[in-house]
Amino acid sequence: MPELPEVETLKNSLESKLIGLVIKKVEFKRDNLRYKLSADLADQIVNTNIINVRRRAKYLIIDFNNNHSLIVHLGMSGRFTLQPNNYEVKKHDHVVFNLSNNEKLIFNDTRRFGMIYSFHTELLEKDFFANLALEPLSDSFELQYLKSKLMNKKVPIKNLLMDNRIVVGVGNIYASESLHLAKIHPDKFGKDLNDDEIKNLIAAVKNVLSKAIIAGGTTLKDFVNGDNKPGYFTQQLMVYARDGQECLSCSSSIIKTKHSGRSTFYCKSCQKA
């Protein structure tokens, strides 16, 4: 599933190309993605100017000048790409946004776990994103904040890192990578981390996410940016999907385990229990 760096990469690839354009027509090739698309979605955004493209957590947001926003979640396999006017719609292209410059913005989703909504812009944070915590790359993600969230939590730190009520945008890939960089065992309970470990973890999360954004995200299978280009952070992964291989830091073997049904990768030498 695309995480914060992938959605930020998508935002960066679309921002300068979409702002100022108008959506002239919306074509629904299929309206039952993860949830059924709203019948009035097209009416809320057609013939209005795009004024901003941004990200919140793992959501891409396109703001229009009529106080409506398009909210897109890529799910497991979603792609949101710009295509020329003569582009021929393919099997898993479910929504086509026809733009005023004669290009098409295509939402493609093989597994159909993606989501597209339209919502009042001014109500997004209050209502739609009401249960989301702060952004990990913000200055507010610091020692006292995370310490307060981990206090009394008898839950593995890997699970807590992926909890959107604590911090947003950190999924399976970047939780494993951040814990490895911080040298923290994924099974360690949140309540048992000391101040130095929490500070190291915050620094590791920021470091890993920032490097992944610079590399254009991680493409394991499906992810591409708005220009249909893959991400290259895959080449910098230290532990994720490297089970049985040598740790790039100490040469011990990378171990694969499970947390809440999700794969976790770590080095038992670098990340002692």
Swiss-Prot record:
GO molecular function, one term: damaged DNA binding
Gene3D superfamilies (alphabetical): 1.10.8.50, MutM-like, N-terminal (3.20.190.10)
Entry-linked Pfam families: Fapy_DNA_glyco, H2TH, zf-FPG_IleRS
UniProt binding sites for DNA: 92, 111, 153
GO BP annotation list: base-excision repair
Cofactor note: Binds 1 zinc ion per subunit.
Keyword flag Zinc-finger: yes
Keyword DNA repair: yes
Keyword entries, A-Z: DNA damage, DNA repair, DNA-binding, Glycosidase, Hydrolase, Lyase, Metal-binding, Multifunctional enzyme, Zinc, Zinc-finger
ZnF segments: FPG-type: 238-272
Catalyzed reactions: Hydrolysis of DNA containing ring-opened 7-methylguanine residues, releasing 2,6-diamino-4-hydroxy-5-(N-methyl)formamidopyrimidine; 2'-deoxyribonucleotide-(2'-deoxyribose 5'-phosphate)-2'-deoxyribonucleotide-DNA = a 3'-end 2'-deoxyribonucleotide-(2,3-dehydro-2,3-deoxyribose 5'-phosphate)-DNA + a 5'-end 5'-phospho-2'-deoxyribonucleoside-DNA + H(+)
The protein's required cofactors: Zn(2+)
Family: Belongs to the FPG family.
Subunit structure: Monomer.
Role, per record: Involved in base excision repair of DNA damaged by oxidation or by mutagenic agents. Acts as a DNA glycosylase that recognizes and removes damaged bases. Has a preference for oxidized purines, such as 7,8-dihydro-8-oxoguanine (8-oxoG). Has AP (apurinic/apyrimidinic) lyase activity and introduces nicks in the DNA strand. Cleaves the DNA backbone by beta-delta elimination to generate a single-strand break at the site of the removed base with both 3'- and 5'-phosphates.
Name of this protein: Formamidopyrimidine-DNA glycosylase
Organism: Rickettsia bellii (strain OSU 85-389)
